C-alpha cells in the first residue's frame, strides 16, 4: 500500500483537518464507550505536539442530513476530549465558510452529517472542506469504505492528503491477518445484520479454516437446519444461502440456546435445546454447550478474526455466550483481530482489551476489507500519493 503517511510530514504551523472516527455511543449526553476516541487520541496529540492548527471531525449517528439535531451533536465527544487533553478544545457549529484555529488549539468541527451533500460525496462541499486546510488526514478506517465528502471528496482537492497513524496501522494489521495467516485460522461473524454479512462469510470461507456464526446470523443457520426459530431475528430469504454455506464449509450451528418471549433487558432467559424453541419464543443467546464447543475451537486457533457478538450481550441474562467466547479469544495464544462497534463494546464490558492483539475501529470497512473490496478512501490516498 503506497500512501503518504501523516508521520512523514512536518505539520508545524499547518492547518490540519483530521477526519477521525468519533462515532461513539452516547447516553444522557455522556459517551458510554470511548474505544474509538481513545484510538484517535494519539493522532490528534501528535498533530498538536507538532504545532499544527488542528481541526478534527466525524459523523455521529444517523441524523437527517443537512439538519442540525442536538441529539447527534459532537458535544459529548468535545467534553470527553477536554478531560483528556491539556490543550484548549472547542466545538464549532458553522465552519464551511472558514474557521480560525490557533496553533496548539483543537477545534472540533460539528457532525459532518449536518452538512447537505456529505453522504453523496458532493463536490462543492468537498471543496469547502478542502479550503479549510493545508493537510487532510484520513484517519477514520471505520468509514474508509464510504465515498463521502469528508472521507473521500476532500482528499481529492486538499493540497496534501495522507493516511493518519491509526488508518495506516489498521491496514497493516488486517493485511497480516488476511494475507498470510498463521493456521488454523478461525473467523467469527456475529451480530444482527445478516444480509450484509453473508457475502463476508462467503469470502472468509475461502480463507479461514473454521467459521463461527453468532447472533441473528446463527438463527438463519439454525433455520437452515430445519429447526423452528419462533420469533427470532433471522432472514428467511437467506436460508438457502445458509444451506449452501453449510455444505461447503465447516460451520458449527448451536445445539442449545437461551430464549425469551420478549426482547427486553428484564426478560428471563430459558436454556433449551435448539429442537425445542416454541413459536412465541426468540433466541437471544447461544447455550452453554454451544459456547463451550466454540471456546474449544478458539483455544486451538493460531489466527482469530472476530466481528460481532454471539448473543444480545447488552442484556445481562443473554450475555453468557458472548462472555465465554470473548474470554476464550482473550486466553488464546492466537494473533487476534477484533472489529465492529458491538464487538468493541463487548471487549470493553469484559475488560479484555489488553488481551486482543489488534482492535480495529472499523465495522463495515473491516468487513469490506476482509471481502477484498477496494476501500474508496484508501484508493483516493493511493492516487494522491502518485502525484
From Swiss-Prot:
<dbReference type="InterPro" id="IPR015911">
    <property type="entry name" value="Phosphoglycerate_kinase_CS"/>
</dbReference>
<dbReference type="GO" id="GO:0004618">
    <property type="term" value="F:phosphoglycerate kinase activity"/>
</dbReference>
<feature type="binding site">
    <location>
        <begin position="340"/>
        <end position="343"/>
    </location>
    <ligand>
        <name>ATP</name>
    </ligand>
</feature>
<dbReference type="GO" id="GO:0005524">
    <property type="term" value="F:ATP binding"/>
</dbReference>
<comment type="similarity">
    <text>Belongs to the phosphoglycerate kinase family.</text>
</comment>
<keyword id="KW-0067">ATP-binding</keyword>
<comment type="subunit">
    <text>Monomer.</text>
</comment>
<dbReference type="Pfam" id="PF00162">
    <property type="entry name" value="PGK"/>
</dbReference>
<comment type="pathway">
    <text>Carbohydrate degradation; glycolysis; pyruvate from D-glyceraldehyde 3-phosphate: step 2/5.</text>
</comment>
<protein>
    <recommendedName>
        <fullName>Phosphoglycerate kinase</fullName>
        <ecNumber>2.7.2.3</ecNumber>
    </recommendedName>
</protein>
<feature type="binding site">
    <location>
        <begin position="59"/>
        <end position="62"/>
    </location>
    <ligand>
        <name>substrate</name>
    </ligand>
</feature>
<keyword id="KW-0418">Kinase</keyword>
<dbReference type="GO" id="GO:0043531">
    <property type="term" value="F:ADP binding"/>
</dbReference>
<keyword id="KW-0808">Transferase</keyword>
<dbReference type="InterPro" id="IPR036043">
    <property type="entry name" value="Phosphoglycerate_kinase_sf"/>
</dbReference>
<keyword id="KW-0324">Glycolysis</keyword>
<feature type="binding site">
    <location>
        <position position="36"/>
    </location>
    <ligand>
        <name>substrate</name>
    </ligand>
</feature>
<dbReference type="GO" id="GO:0005829">
    <property type="term" value="C:cytosol"/>
</dbReference>
<keyword id="KW-0963">Cytoplasm</keyword>
<dbReference type="GO" id="GO:0006094">
    <property type="term" value="P:gluconeogenesis"/>
</dbReference>
<keyword id="KW-0547">Nucleotide-binding</keyword>
<feature type="binding site">
    <location>
        <position position="314"/>
    </location>
    <ligand>
        <name>ATP</name>
    </ligand>
</feature>
<feature type="binding site">
    <location>
        <position position="197"/>
    </location>
    <ligand>
        <name>ATP</name>
    </ligand>
</feature>
<feature type="binding site">
    <location>
        <position position="146"/>
    </location>
    <ligand>
        <name>substrate</name>
    </ligand>
</feature>
<dbReference type="InterPro" id="IPR015824">
    <property type="entry name" value="Phosphoglycerate_kinase_N"/>
</dbReference>
<dbReference type="InterPro" id="IPR001576">
    <property type="entry name" value="Phosphoglycerate_kinase"/>
</dbReference>
<feature type="modified residue" description="N6-acetyllysine">
    <location>
        <position position="84"/>
    </location>
</feature>
<dbReference type="GO" id="GO:0006096">
    <property type="term" value="P:glycolytic process"/>
</dbReference>
<feature type="binding site">
    <location>
        <position position="113"/>
    </location>
    <ligand>
        <name>substrate</name>
    </ligand>
</feature>
<feature type="binding site">
    <location>
        <begin position="21"/>
        <end position="23"/>
    </location>
    <ligand>
        <name>substrate</name>
    </ligand>
</feature>
<keyword id="KW-0007">Acetylation</keyword>
Amino acid at each position: 500500500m503506497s500512501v503518504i503517511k501523516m508521520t512523514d510530514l512536518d505539520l508545524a504551523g499547518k492547518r490540519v483537518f483530521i477526519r477521525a472516527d468519533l462515532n461513539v455511543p452516547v447516553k444522557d449526553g455522556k459517551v458510554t464507550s470511548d474505544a474509538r476516541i481513545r484510538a484517535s487520541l494519539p493522532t490528534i496529540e501528535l498533530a498538536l505536539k507538532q504545532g499544527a492548527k488542528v481541526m478534527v471531525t466525524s459523523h455521529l449517528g444517523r441524523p437527517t442530513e443537512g439538519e442540525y439535531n442536538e441529539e447527534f451533536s459532537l458535544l459529548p465527544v468535545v467534553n470527553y476530549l477536554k478531560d483528556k487533553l491539556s490543550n484548549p478544545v472547542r466545538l464549532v457549529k458553522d465552519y464551511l465558510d472558514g474557521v480560525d484555529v490557533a496553533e496548539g488549539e483543537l477545534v472540533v468541527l460539528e457532525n459532518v452529517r449536518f452538512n447537505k451533500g456529505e453522504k453523496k460525496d458532493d463536490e462543492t462541499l468537498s471543496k469547502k472542506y478542502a479550503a479549510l486546510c493545508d493537510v487532510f488526514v484520513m484517519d477514520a478506517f471505520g468509514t474508509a469504505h464510504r465515498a463521502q465528502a469528508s472521507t473521500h471528496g476532500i482528499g481529492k482537492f486538499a493540497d496534501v492528503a495522507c493516511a493518519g497513524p491509526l488508518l495506516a496501522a489498521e491496514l497493516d494489521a488486517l493485511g497480516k491477518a488476511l494475507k498470510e495467516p498463521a493456521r488454523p485460522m478461525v473467523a467469527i461473524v456475529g451480530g444482527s445484520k445478516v444480509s450484509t454479512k453473508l457475502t463476508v462469510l462467503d469470502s472468509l470461507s475461502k480463507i479461514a479454516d473454521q467459521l463461527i456464526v453468532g447472533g441473528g446470523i446463527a438463527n438463519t443457520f439454525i433455520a437452515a437446519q430445519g429447526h423452528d426459530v419462533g420469533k427470532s431475528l433471522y432472514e428467511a430469504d437467506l436460508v438457502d444461502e445458509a444451506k449452501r454455506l453449510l455444505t461447503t464449509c465447516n460451520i458449527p450451528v448451536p445445539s442449545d440456546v437461551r430464549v425469551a418471549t420478549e426482547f427486553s433487558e428484564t426478560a428471563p432467559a430459558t436454556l433449551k435445546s435448539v429442537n425445542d424453541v416454541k413459536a412465541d419464543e426468540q433466541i437471544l443467546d447461544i447455550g452453554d454447550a454451544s459456547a463451550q464447543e466454540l471456546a474449544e475451537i478458539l483455544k486451538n486457533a493460531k489466527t482469530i478474526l472476530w466481528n460481532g457478538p454471539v448473543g444480545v450481550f447488552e442484556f445481562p441474562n443473554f450475555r453468557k455466550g458472548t462472555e465465554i467466547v470473548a474470554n476464550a479469544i482473550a486466553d488464546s495464544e492466537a494473533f487476534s483481530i477484533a472489529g465492529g462497534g458491538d464487538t468493541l463494546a463487548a471487549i470493553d464490558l469484559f475488560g479484555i482489551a489488553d488481551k486482543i492483539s489488534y482492535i480495529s475501529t472499523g465495522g463495515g470497512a473491516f468487513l469490506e476489507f476482509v471481502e477484498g473490496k477496494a476501500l474508496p478512501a484508501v484508493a483516493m490516498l493511493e492516487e494522491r500519493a502518485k502525484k
